[in-house]
Amino acid sequence: MGSSTDHGGAGGRGKKGSGSQLWKKALLHSSLCFVMGFFTGFAPSSVSDWTSAAVSAGGVGSSHVVRSLHATGGAAVNRSLLAQAAAGAVDAGPQPLLVVVTTTESTPSAAGQRAAALTRMAHTLRLVPPPLLWVVVEANPDVAATARLLRTTGLMYRHLTYKDNFTVADAAAGKERHHQRNVALGHIEHHRLAGVVLFAGLGDTFDLRFFDQLRQIRTFGAWPVATMSQNERKVVVQGPACSSSSVAGWFSMDLSNATSPVAVGGAGYGAAAARPRELDVHGFAFNSSVLWDPERWGRYPTSEPDKSQDSVKFVQQVVLEDYSKVRGIPSDCSEVMAKLRTVSQQLEATWRSALAIINELLRACASVHGHVRSKLDSLYRSDFPQTEPETLICLIHDHASHYIYGGRFLSGDFC
């Protein structure tokens, strides 16, 4: 019996040993599976690797991808074109910021045209590739209407205002616009808005290629500008005289007068007397870093505060002093890409005086005030550009007297 007991104890120990071996194998197998799964999760997808490798190699995989895109229809083709354009933009690198400064007028005659002109400029700027910042400056009383308009443009903008008051005479002399430009440049300098600054008036017309040329400016850029005066039937072209993209001087010519001489001046032409005293702000652009250049304050003595503290005059002066830093736009300056439209100050003053007279006459006729004003605005747009001042006053008199009391309100001896 003792021997049988001994055999039974040996068999139990054998079963326990085999059971522990099974547990060890299962634990080892589970550990290996866990480790393999853990590291496999960090590995990239093999399918995406094969696809990208085939496309990049330009082999069979690439041809299959192209055929499938052409077979899916127009929508896929349009998306592929957009992707190609985006890829081209990425390859070209980040583009410099364009800061477009637009000034307005606070005079009564300009209030009704401001919204239409701002809308026109907004449509133009929306065609320019980003990044672009539109800086609009205007007097404080006109803020609300313009703010609503700017919010609907879809452009990145900054709306600047000021509380300074300017008379009609100051506005006609350009003092208000000059102040607005300094307000804009002060904002750019204060916030260090790095980019290329362009002054664009509400009546200006630009070639869209012009904005691509602006992004190539490193310090200063200048271009020929055609100024069209509708009232004087006159077209004057002014701008840099270039050799390739280098500026050698400045020229001015009257295209409406075939016998008018071409004035050319500058260091490259040996005619310093013809060098303009001051550049038109619509004829150049500059890198905004010039505004916070430390050399700015040491360039001019304190006896000339306009050149050191007046930002607009400072930039105008620097452009004229150093031609080597000015880039001609386009190359050879052989094309007019910016056009300005002006109205003579004499006719503007006459129009304002006539409006003041009409407003006095309409004080007792408030019910027809809006009708008469609409007729006057229509007259201004249609006849004003081709009308002499004396004739304009007579036309306004005739229209106003006719629409108030059938022509009997004013004396016919006025004209």
From Swiss-Prot:
It is found in: Golgi apparatus membrane. Residues 1-25 are cytoplasmic. Its EC number is 2.4.-.-. Keywords: Cell wall biogenesis/degradation, Glycoprotein, Glycosyltransferase, Golgi apparatus, Membrane, Signal-anchor, Transferase, Transmembrane, Transmembrane helix. SUPFAM superfamilies: Nucleotide-diphospho-sugar transferases. Glycans are attached at residues 78, 165, 257, 287. Residues 44-415 are lumenal. One of its GO terms (molecular function) is xylosyltransferase activity. Involved in the synthesis of glucuronoxylan hemicellulose in secondary cell walls. This is Probable glucuronosyltransferase Os03g0287800. It comes from Oryza sativa subsp. japonica (Rice).
